[in-house]
């Protein structure tokens, strides 16, 4: 569960990874190859165009865990104590500030890293794949805003070909915003007996996000303080030729009544990212 992963030391992934992709996992928490840093957005005076340039001097920015959440990294940096210890996560103790009380700006953060684009990506289409950010985000590469995201579960494939510097250092900066409606742990006035606290007051359901971030019967009734704000899934870099195939889908139709024959229909999405207009 993500609510558990938020506060645990991340381990080396044991799931399949495409060997043709460069995964931008952080050194912190994941033993990855990339240095990620974070800084509170409303305390960052420089414009995004500067923050997202290679060689930007981060100064007092903190190390960040990516994939991970804002609170994940804040706990890692000893800003807040471990939520799973004792009563640290109790809302009424206010040890870790709650998003519903602080407002969205409190957990809105910049994350940035730098990466090299390999020489063998030359004359190819270069992609940045962002698998999941909770909840909204601005994606900046080398001083340019290349994409916006909203919704916890929607991946984005961003064509960075015209902005990538082949064989050179590149910078990626992502401004991450929490959910629009964080909800509260106040129980709903409706529902089955014993589940009134599930999803708090229900307002978090106005976002496309993880409802149990505000509290559920098998996790913290008091919820997760930042509502799992952050870059919670992988970010990767890869290159393709001019034809791109994505989202394969197989539809099966079984013959009745014996179900001894099946008709299989395979569909894919094919695009040419070099086409303009």
Question: Where are each of the predicted segments found?
Answer:
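Accessory beta-strand-rich segments of carbohydrate-active enzymes
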Residues: 12-20, 40-43, 77, 83, ...
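Beta-strand-rich binding/interaction modules
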Residues: 139-141, 260-277
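N-terminal pre-domain segments of enzymes
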Residues: 11-50
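Predominantly extracellular/luminal regions of secreted and cell-surface proteins
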Residues: 38-39, 50-79, 228
């Amino acid at each position: 569960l993500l609510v558990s992963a938020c506060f645990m030391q991340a381990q080396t992934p044991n799931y399949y990874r495409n060997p043709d992709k460069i995964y931008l996992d952080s050194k912190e928490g994941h033993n990855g190859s990339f240095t990620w840093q974070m800084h509170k957005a409303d305390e960052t005076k420089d414009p995004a165009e500067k923050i997202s340039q290679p060689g930007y001097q981060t100064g007092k920015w903190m190390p960040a865990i990516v994939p991970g959440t804002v609170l994940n990294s804040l706990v890692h940096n000893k800003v807040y104590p471990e939520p799973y210890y004792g009563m640290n996560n109790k809302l009424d103790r206010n040890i870790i500030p709650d998003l519903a009380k602080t407002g969205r700006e409190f957990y809105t953060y910049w994350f940035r890293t730098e990466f090299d684009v390999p020489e063998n990506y030359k004359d190819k289409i270069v992609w940045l794949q962002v698998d999941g950010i909770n909840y909204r985000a601005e994606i900046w590469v080398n001083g340019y805003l290349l994409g916006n995201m909203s919704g916890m579960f929607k991946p984005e494939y961003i064509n960075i070909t015209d902005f990538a510097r082949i064989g050179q250092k590149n910078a990626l900066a992502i401004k991450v915003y929490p959910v629009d409606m964080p909800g509260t742990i106040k129980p709903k006035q409706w529902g089955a007996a014993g589940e009134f606290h599930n999803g708090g007051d229900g307002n978090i359901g106005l976002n496309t996000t993880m409802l149990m971030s505000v509290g559920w019967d098998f996790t913290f009734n008091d919820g997760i303080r930042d509502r799992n704000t952050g870059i919670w899934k992988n970010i990767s870099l890869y290159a393709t030729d001019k034809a791109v195939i994505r989202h394969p889908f197989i539809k099966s139709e079984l013959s009745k009544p014996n179900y001894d024959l099946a008709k299989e229909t395979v569909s894919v999405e094919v695009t040419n990212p070099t086409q303009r207009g």
